[in-house]
UniProtKB/Swiss-Prot annotation:
Residues 338-434, 448-526 are annotated as: Disordered. Its main location: nucleus. It comes from Mus musculus (Mouse). This is PHD finger protein 1. It comes from the Eukaryota. The lineage of its organism: Eukaryota, Metazoa, Chordata, Craniata, Vertebrata.
Amino acid sequence: MAQLPRLSRLGAPSLWDPASPAPTSGPRPRLWEGQDVLARWTDGLLYLGTIKKVDSAREVCLVQFEDDSQFLVLWKDISPAALPGEELLCCVCRSETVVPGNRLVSCEKCRHAYHQDCHVPRAPAPGEGEGASWVCRQCVFAIATKRGGALKKGPYARAMLGMKLSLPYGLKGLDWDAGHLSNRQQSYCYCGGPGEWNLKMLQCRSCLQWFHEACTQCLSKPLLYGDRFYEFECCVCRGGPEKVRRLQLRWVDVAHLVLYHLSVCCKKKYFDFDREILPFTSENWDSLLLGELSDTPKGERSSQLLSALNSHKDRFISGREIKKRKCLFGLHARTPPPVELLTGDGAPTSFPSGQGPGGGVSRPLGKRWRSEPEPLRRRQKGKVEELGPPTAAHSRHGSREQRALQASVSPPPPSPNQSYEGSSGYNFRPTDARCLPSSPIRMFASFHPSASTAGTSGDSEPPDRSPLGLHIGFPTDTPKSSPHSVTASSSSVPALTPGFSRHSPPSPLCRSLSPGTGGGVRGGVSYLSRGDPVRVLARRVRPDGSVQYLVEWGGGGIF
């Protein structure tokens, strides 16, 4: 098992011992290769890393973190250490010019110098304020931000509240998408760092900006992934402390929220009701803040959740529909539950899944995304008939089995700054089952008892699994050939499936049944002519772009 990432945050940047830049004839650069820096992530926290490459054209750096992962980070999200000899150089404008009323002030923690007007909010002159020492905005946020919510008491909590009354960027100058979920500048929250709207962020009802959980000081419990059932107002809009109110949830919202949170944490689609959904809900019952539902007796919670999962077919899919255990449940589309908020005039406004108050365009995880429709197929007594492109009626009323077979969990689209595993802040029941460490491309929780290393539960989805369930590229325990099995080759689907590696070696089972062998396509014609039953077991895409199907004839089982 691969070692889990080891993440580190430094509250005092003055502890760094940065490498010196290579001597040059020009001015000393702010960032260079080999420099130790703090990089702000999509969760609002700072992580220690080393710069590997600097791209001045795009203003990004390739940063290697302590878990040996490397990602591109924007210059604005990188905090380097102060260098000797730069005590009289402003770290914002890179100027030493001093005029009356705009003097240079040094931070007590990081030793960076700021012009009074370059710092947001305006820095006090030396000797002014409550104390003789002064701490900059970067250091205050580095110390006060925490998973689950920032500090609420103490001098740094009070200093952070004062900093949060103004933003370090121009809110009106941000270029937002139609759903007001992401902006081109990747500037969010009070810290100005990157973010992902569905990964533990709150949206202000007034300015519509998104704020990290780690930077807020109003939460009593940690957020779940995709939990937007809050009415939140930021410090900038209120001119003082934040205000938050929990919205009332229905049982269908609870089931949807729990399933979405588990799917993001565990990177799989289906979850066992008795072993995963109900235990997670029960152990975190108080943290869910369910309002009127919180008084529900323990004996009724199971029946209420199960009724919501079974009665809302438009949101949930059960294992019975895909010929698995009936106690398995998953989401039809991995999007957060829809939320109904009150606008400024008091009228309720519904925000469907994947949408925000700024528009009505649905886009999963805040990115533009559209899947190409696949031709519909119909099974008739031993043959698969091609029906051509799907019509609107077929799209709405297609068979449940066909939708279930084609359903797969789409990974979040990567952004320049999306990646770390963090503690979810919620309890998971320890079991004997072990889980794979999360891929460093997503910010997911690391442990959950249902994530198996070998897919033994039958409902997990390894990264290199085809949509129909065949574990491509890994040896299997199944026989290399079967008298009732055949693969049908096709080139009608040229595109690779998400998560499929074009260079993955084929499994021994499919390789032994490729066309031209004793079990080729020609051998299946006789089965079709006799009207024997046929079942498509799996599909794979070969390096040349052709598609092969693993077909079972005669009703025999090989797994």
